Amino acid sequence: MMRGLFSRRTALAAAVEYSLLLALGAAAPAAYAAEVKVMSTVALTPTLGELTPEYESGSGNKLTIIYNTIADLKKRIDAGETADLMILSRPVLDDLQTQGKVAQGSIVNVGRSYVAIGVRAGAPQPDISTAEKLKVALLAAKSISYADPAKGGASGVYFAKVLDRLGIADQMKSKTVLVPNAQAGELVANGEVEMGVAQASEIAAVPGTQVVGPLPGDLHIEMIFSVGIGSMSKDPAAAKSLIELLTSPTGAAVLKSKGMDPA
């Protein structure tokens, strides 16, 4: 009888142990999942927004993404903030690599975008095919919006110089709404301003807007956005797997659908 009782207890213990092993096995992917911190220019917001679910479900990792202007992100990194992955302009990443804040040899070009003019969907599209016609269109607009140069938005800094080159900076001040980050498209969509100036990808990402086109002639400027792995990354392999998705055919298709050309 004691032998039978012992056998039943042994079997019960084995069953409990097996159940625990199954439970631990099921929990293993979550236990070893990496949390990948990304510091990204707002220009990649639409692309990362669409790719995040695919990355997280495919890798089991979790993305934490901080979006801001390149200038503000650079300030934070210079002040000592770290990230697993940084998506910024190529010159800024090259500088951070020189400083030792981006891992050597990890920088990869992801996409190209250009500063564009946008209007509300369905609204007449102004002729901006030459510098002179752009000047006429800007002067005729009731209101425009672009990123505040003082906040470091790359498109805003550049467009302020364009207004100077066109000789209409003072004339445009009274009808210009300066915004932080990439909000010009939202003001256009809401009807708060007639015309917005931003990265084409930022305008295209806002429902209710349409991209008229890039700045014409020698006013045209194209920006290359690149990605690099932080030298202090806790999981470089997890960070690299996101780079691989961004540069894959799937990533390229998403970039293109968001108004950006694969690099």
Regions found by a protein language model. Name each.
Residues 32-71, 75-79, 90-100, 108-113, ...:
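Exported/periplasmic ABC-transporter solute-binding proteins
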Residues 19-21, 31:
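Cleavable N-terminal signal peptides
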Residues 6-12, 16:
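N-terminal export leaders
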Residues 84-87:
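Periplasmic-binding protein-like
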